[in-house]
């Protein structure tokens, strides 16, 4: 090589070509400043670089891979890129290679090369085409240098994606660290068309567990995300023919366990949004207020209910929601809501294996089923008490404090009671929400009188449903009665009313006024 680069009389070879018409064969050539310390091979060009006279003497890149943006050639081959120098596409060619990109020249910014090429695609989403290479192409990762390892060559693939840029410019390879996202691409050179429904590639995100990447099936994505080192679905149990199919696994405590979807969920391991109380699912019990809309899919429940996660059961109707319980032991909090007036009949707790066996309606504690925190439960109604037509009833206000564990109560409507303490059997009183501490019940006591109305006009009475502020027996058809002087229809002497029964007694003025007999 004649001349000297220090004379400033030689041409500077562009990075896009090794053989140019601006430099005559045998003239001085200035090597790029970044690679002057390396050994370069200069080949004599013939016929204006139209033919090759050298044998294939390809060597490894003479500069580091991290900064290898300089050309490396053996035979004089001109490979003109289809993008500008500012876009970072600098081809490196060896031997005769056809520069035919997979898309139009105006839309493709990646050349076709034999050796490794570092390029940064600058095309848009609709025009992002993968390069067609003979062996391999290394692309600059789309993430920062600190989070990506050294680029690794991979087999080429022709893909016309319809997805975003993030799936077109991902680092490829298998030598990935725990902090490097890896894109698993098909190893065949056959065209792989990504459909719009499955355009996302297989991406392994960093996690505290070792994530395993598998090749997708028919462009189906499989996303591996961190799962707190304990994946919800460790191994597929339904089907192992394809990694994209669903697998059977125990549902997460943070997800509903009684849904209409199939038991086999997609094989996607996601991070738990909350710490589960227990890892086994609980069961949903349909309310008896309305017929169940979906068949019961009760599984083996656990002995605890997650209270910090999402609701396990959704309310099927505003009448009465489904009750989430567990067996064979008691949950942390056991709540049963009362039915509003929309329900035609009083609601009784359904008896099913998914509920505690010893918790019967109307009872809140027993030797096995004893609550440890506030709860609500139903008090079922009893049958109507018949009223006699020849006997009048005078209301007498008296508080009734029944033991909690003394069997069924005789109220006509389902009350929702609340125990704000750990109840023990046979406590003296219980409370009703929005009611006094002790429920005031009215009983009908016969009062002697002599009716003068005929048998056809006799007093007809009917028992209506009672509440804590209503009478058990109410006249439906008042009639005129001749009260004898011996036993007139007089009000009974007013008795002192405790503060507990003051609300109910105020609603019944019969204790201070004569009865309309």
Curated annotation (Swiss-Prot):
Q: Where is this region: 11 X 5 AA repeats of C-C-X(3)?
A: 73-307
sequence repeat positions: 73-77, 93-97, 128-132, 153-157, 168-172, 198-202, 208-212, 228-232, 248-252, 283-287, 303-307
GO annotation, cellular component aspect: cytosol; keratin filament
Provide this UniProt record's keywords sorted from A to Z: Keratin, Repeat
GO terms assigned for molecular function: structural molecule activity
**Cross-referenced InterPro entries:** KAP, Keratin_matx
Kindly indicate whether the keyword Repeat belongs to this entry.
Answer: yes
**A Pfam family per the record:** Keratin_B2_2
Stretches of Low complexity bias are at: 504-517
Chain intervals for the UniProt region annotation (Disordered)? 483-517
Secreted as UniProt keyword: no
Q: Which family does it belong to?
A: Belongs to the KRTAP type 16 family.
Q: What is this protein called?
A: Keratin-associated protein 16-1
Q: Which source organism does the UniProt entry give?
A: Homo sapiens
- Annotated gene: KRTAP16-1
């Amino acid at each position: 090589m004649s001349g000297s680069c220090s004379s400033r009389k030689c041409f500077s070879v562009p990075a896009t070509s090794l053989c140019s018409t601006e430099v005559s064969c045998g003239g001085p050539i200035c090597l790029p400043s970044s690679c002057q310390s390396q050994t370069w091979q200069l080949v004599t060009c013939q016929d204006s670089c139209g033919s090759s006279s050298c044998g294939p003497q390809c060597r490894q890149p003479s500069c580091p891979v991290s900064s290898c943006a300089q050309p490396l050639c053996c035979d004089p081959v001109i490979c003109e890129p289809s993008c500008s120098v500012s876009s970072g596409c600098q081809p490196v060619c060896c031997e005769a290679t056809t520069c035919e990109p997979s898309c139009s020249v105006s839309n493709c910014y990646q050349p076709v090369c034999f050796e490794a090429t570092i390029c940064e695609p600058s095309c848009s989403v609709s025009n992002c085409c993968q390069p067609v290479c003979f062996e391999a192409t290394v692309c600059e990762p789309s993430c920062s240098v600190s989070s990506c390892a050294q680029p690794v060559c991979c087999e080429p693939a022709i893909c016309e994606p319809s997805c975003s840029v993030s799936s077109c410019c991902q680092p490829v390879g298998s030598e990935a660290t725990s902090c490097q996202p890896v894109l698993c691409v098909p190893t065949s050179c056959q065209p792989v068309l990504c459909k719009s429904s499955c355009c996302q590639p297989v991406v392994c995100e960093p996690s505290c567990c070792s994530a395993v990447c598998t090749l997708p099936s028919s462009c189906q994505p499989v996303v591996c995300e961190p799962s707190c080192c304990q994946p919800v679905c460790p191994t597929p149990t339904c089907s192992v023919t394809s990694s994209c199919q669903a697998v059977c696994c125990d549902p997460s405590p943070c997800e509903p366990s009684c849904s209409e979807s199939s038991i086999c969920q997609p094989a996607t391991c996601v991070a738990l949004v909350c710490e589960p109380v227990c890892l086994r699912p609980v069961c949903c019990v349909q309310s008896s207020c309305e017929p169940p809309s979906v068949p019961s899919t009760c599984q083996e429940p656990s002995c605890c209910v997650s209270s910090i996660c999402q609701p396990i059961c959704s309310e099927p109707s505003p009448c009465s929601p489904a009750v989430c319980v567990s067996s064979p032991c008691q949950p942390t909090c056991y709540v049963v809501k009362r039915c509003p007036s929309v329900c035609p009949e009083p609601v009784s707790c359904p008896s099913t294996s998914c509920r505690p066996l010893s918790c019967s309606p109307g009872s809140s504690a027993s030797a096995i089923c004893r609550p440890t925190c506030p709860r609500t439960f139903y008090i079922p109604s009893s049958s109507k008490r018949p009223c006699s037509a020849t006997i009048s009833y005078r209301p007498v206000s008296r508080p009734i404090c029944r033991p909690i564990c003394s069997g069924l109560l005789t109220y006509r409507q389902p009350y929702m009671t609340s125990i704000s303490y750990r109840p023990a059997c046979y406590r003296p009183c219980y409370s009703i929400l929005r009611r006094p501490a002790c429920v005031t019940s009215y009983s009908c006591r016969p009062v002697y009188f002599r009716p003068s109305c005929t048998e056809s006009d006799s007093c007809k009475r009917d028992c209506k449903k009672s509440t804590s502020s209503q009478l058990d027996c109410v006249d439906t058809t008042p009639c005129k009665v001749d009260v004898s002087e011996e036993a007139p229809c007089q009000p009974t002497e007013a008795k002192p009313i405790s503060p507990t029964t003051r609300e109910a007694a105020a609603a019944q003025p019969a204790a201070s006024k004569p009865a309309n007999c």
